[in-house]
UniProtKB/Swiss-Prot annotation:
InterPro entries for the chain: EF-G-like_DII, EFG_II, EFG_III, EFG_III/V, EFG_IV, EFG_V, EFG_V-like, G_TR_CS
Name listed for the protein in its UniProt record: Elongation factor G
Cellular location(s): Cytoplasm
Main localisation: cytoplasm
């Protein structure tokens, strides 16, 4: 018998909490769980006791690495929350949680406003069309400035963000917030851990400013809502309900971003933020339809949430749990799913059996018999499913829009101590790569060396740490190296002909391929332009495969060749001696032959770097950037500090943290994000080729 759903769809919210590192995101999530009755004791991140940060490394480092999913209840609504990491190395975690969310809270530090990683996740959220509300946190902190934070939203994100609250006081005088829609003040009782507050009239000394800000808010809402605009121009009264409904609609349409204020650490403003989640962020019924494809005829399908439709969901994370093994986190878009039933992994075209279904609270779990449209849950028992796979009803296959994962930019070598460690290492690498699509492991067939690559030094540190702790691998870890790429800069055509006669059956494959540089980021594209069957149909996939395999090893120094188009336009075959492997080898020969005329170049990752330091160190920092082949893109003052924005090659950034620390007596900090690939200077290219014993 079917179970009844506990919360209707319009009372469901799937939200993420995203921010720059140290903006107080995990603390905000903790407080939400505390006030919604999920936790009985508040855990502080800086004491290493936080509920959401459940991996050992997270508690030691005080940062969030994996997106823990948890379910809370607020005023008759179910709120599924995904806590995402703020550190740039873990952008993938943010990216994949955004894919399955309907809305998000962006947390800002009231002193710093919008920071580099905030810009990153904001851009990602815009790409996925995720509506957001903003929480200006740490209003109790020295230097907290609500208006400055508001300015950075406009200047750095070009966001149409408007305050629906204003803070009462700041720094150690921060007492609560004024609700600009209700025109009431919520003032907190200092002793009650934020569980009690008084709702009173706006204090007299704030009335003028609050009235002015409310008028600005109404005007901003009128700009994005015609009905409100008409009333505004006619001078008619706009009710609170109309104002809220208009803000909700504009937020869902990504035209408006409501801003809240508070201090999660001091337990102020979190309940009003939760009201904001319910009031302004969409339920699964409010968001645009989800795009899907029918794999049988490639037709486009639009999915609207509802329990009465066939089951369709998306796996967005794989985690290994010490007690139950492999967990697949997934979002249900349509239909329902019962534990014990069979589903189709439509991406891989494989049937899977759902063992048990769990709803997660951080890393505690409740077993549930059934999940409904709009739910986020974890399944045990899915053997073939990886991140980004579509899970559907067996008779209604659909492929949901998947996720795009950036390529890793940094790598280290791993050398196991013993044969036994080699086996453990292989298992560890397989499991870790299943969990994290931006973590890659490959063994060089010629040297036998294993290289692991990821999004940054911290990312790889944590992966190595997990290999040691969870899989007990003993291994030597090399120095970090840059994940270079290779590409062609000119058009070139070449023949690849492989003929072998040595008694018995011979080998024969012959192809002509034209190579052209492709647009940056477009990857490898293959075109079959064979006319008249000079290369038989059945061998064409082998030609493409042969090109792909030899591109993986590059043509100059062994780095993958990217952004190249290959057009197979001529060739010949032998009735008896031709086979798939001969054409595969012929294709790789064509690539090698073309490389000589195609202007092959080595590309290096260029990072967008932001350095923040007191003004007196500005000269030193500019000098350091230039010495590292960097280009300064701009500078701005923030308080008494200077911010330098620059583009610097990743290879020059190793060890920069130490250099910056000693140059600024520990007062400077920096963040970096991968931006693009660019050709390395000729002299450096020659060094790299020589070092790798390349061509």
């Amino acid at each position: 018998m079917a179970n009844k759903r506990e919360f209707p769809l319009d009372k469901t919210r799937n939200i993420g909490i995203m921010a720059h590192i140290d903006a107080g995101k995990t603390t905000t999530t903790e407080r939400i769980l505390y006030y919604t009755g999920k936790i009985h004791k508040i855990g502080e991140t800086h004491e290493g006791a936080s509920q959401m940060d459940w991996m050992e490394q997270e508690q030691e480092r005080g940062i969030t690495i994996t997106s823990a999913a948890t379910t809370a209840e607020w005023k008759g609504n179910r709120v599924n929350i995904i806590d995402t990491p703020g550190h740039v190395d873990f952008t993938i975690e943010v990216e994949r949680s955004l894919r399955v969310l309907d809305g998000a809270i962006t947390v800002l530090d009231a002193q710093s406003g919008v920071e580099p990683q905030t810009e990153n996740v904001w851009r990602q959220a815009t790409t996925y069309g995720v509506p957001r509300i903003v929480f200006v946190n740490k209003m109790d902190k020295l230097g907290a400035n609500f208006d400055y934070s508001m300015t950075t939203l406009e200047d750095r994100l070009q966001a149409n963000a408007h305050a629906v609250q204003m803070p009462i006081g700041a720094e150690d005088e921060f007492q609560g917030v004024i609700d600009l829609i209700e025109m009431q003040a919520d003032i907190y009782d200092e002793d009650e851990l934020g569980a009690k507050w008084d709702t009173v009239d706006v204090p007299a000394d704030y009335l003028e400013e609050a009235t002015k800000r409310r008028a600005e808010l109404v005007e901003a809402v009128a700009d994005v809502n015609d009905d409100i605009m008409d009333k505004y121009l006619e001078g008619e009264e706009i009710s609170k309900e109309e104002l809220k409904a208009a803000i909700r609609q504009a937020t869902i349409d990504l035209k408006f971003f409501p801003v809240f204020a508070g201090s999660a650490f001091k337990n102020k403003g979190v309940q009003m933020l939760m009201d904001g989640v319910v009031d302004y962020l969409p339920s699964p019924l409010d968001v645009r339809p989800y795009n899907a494809k029918n794999p049988e005829d490639d037709s486009e399908v639009e999915l609207m949430a509802g329990d009465d439709k066939p089951f369709a969901g998306l796996a967005f994370k794989i985690a290994t749990d010490p007690f139950v093994g492999r967990l697949t986190f997934f979002r249900v878009y349509t239909g329902t799913l019962q534990s014990g039933s069979y589903i189709l992994n439509a991406t891989k075209d494989k049937r899977e059996r759902v063992g048990r279904l769990l709803q997660m609270h951080s890393n505690h779990r409740n077993e549930i018999p059934e999940v409904f449209s709009g739910d986020i849950a974890a399944a045990i028992g899915l053997k073939n499913t990886t991140t980004g796979d579509s899970l559907t009803d067996v008779d209604h296959p659909l492929i949901l829009e998947s996720m795009e994962f950036p390529d890793p930019v940094i790598q280290v070598s791993v050398e196991p101590e013993s044969k036994e460690d080699r086996d453990k290492l292989d298992l560890a690498l397989q499991k870790l790569a299943e969990e994290d699509p931006t973590f890659k492991a490959e063994t060089n067939n010629e040297t036998g060396e294993t290289l692991i690559s990821g999004m940054g030094e911290l990312h790889l540190d944590i992966m190595v740490d997990r290999m040691r702790r969870e899989f007990k691998v003993v291994a030597k870890i090399g120095e970090p190296q840059v994940a270079y790429r290779e590409t062609f800069t000119k058009q070139a055509s070449a023949q690849g002909k492989f003929v072998r006669q040595s008694g018995g059956k011979g080998q024969y494959g012959d192809v002509w391929v034209e190579f052209t540089p492709n647009e940056e980021g477009k990857g490898f594209e293959f075109e079959d332009a064979i006319v008249g069957g000079v290369v038989p149909r059945e061998y064409i996939p082998s030609v493409e495969q042969g090109l792909k395999e030899s591109m993986a090893n590059g043509v100059l120094a062994g780095y993958p060749l990217i952004d190249v188009k290959a057009k197979l336009y001529d060739g010949s075959y032998h009735d008896v001696d031709s086979n798939e492997s001969a054409f595969k080898i012929a294709a790789s020969m064509a690539l090698k032959n073309a490389a000589k005329q195609a202007g092959a170049e080595i590309l290096e990752p260029i990072m967008k770097v932001e350095v923040i330091a007191p003004e007196e160190y500005l000269g030193d920092i500019m000098g350091q950037v230039t010495a590292r082949r960097g280009a300064v893109e701009g500078m701005e003052a923030r308080g008494n500090a200077q911010i330098v924005n620059a583009m610097v090659p990743l290879s020059e950034m190793f060890g920069y943290a130490t250099t910056l620390r000693s140059a600024t007596q520990g007062r400077g900090t920096f963040t970096m994000v991968f931006d693009h690939y660019s050709a390395v200077p000729k002299s450096i290219q020659e060094e790299i080729i020589k070092k790798n014993g390349g061509q």
